[in-house]
């Protein structure tokens, strides 16, 4: 069953992290993961579990990232969506 929520890929998640000015350690802490998990995911060394990917995406969304699925998958920053400032 689809929830209609956009599921971002590793490249989009990394770009969103960089856009927010977060390093891998900061994102890992925010998502409740390790820096090694973030690094391996971004490098494509491991495919994350759905829960891992969801935790990464949720941590970014709480900081104002809105993931989109138009012509190409992507994201934008929406200041009104910020729950946790970076």
List the model feature ranges, each with a label.
Residues 1-18, 68:
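A short, Lys/Arg-rich alpha-helix, primarily the initiator
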Residues 13, 24-28, 38-41:
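Conserved hydrophobic/aromatic packing and binding residues within compact polymer-binding modules
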Residues 19, 30:
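Residues within the alpha-helical elements of helix-turn-helix
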Residues 22, 33, 65:
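Short glycine/serine/threonine/alanine-rich loop segments
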Residues 32-48:
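Recognition helix of helix-turn-helix/homeodomain-like DNA-binding domains
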Residues 51-69:
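DNA major-groove recognition helix of helix-turn-helix/homeodomain DNA-binding modules
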Residues 65-86:
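Helix-turn-helix/homeodomain-like alpha-helical modules used for DNA recognition
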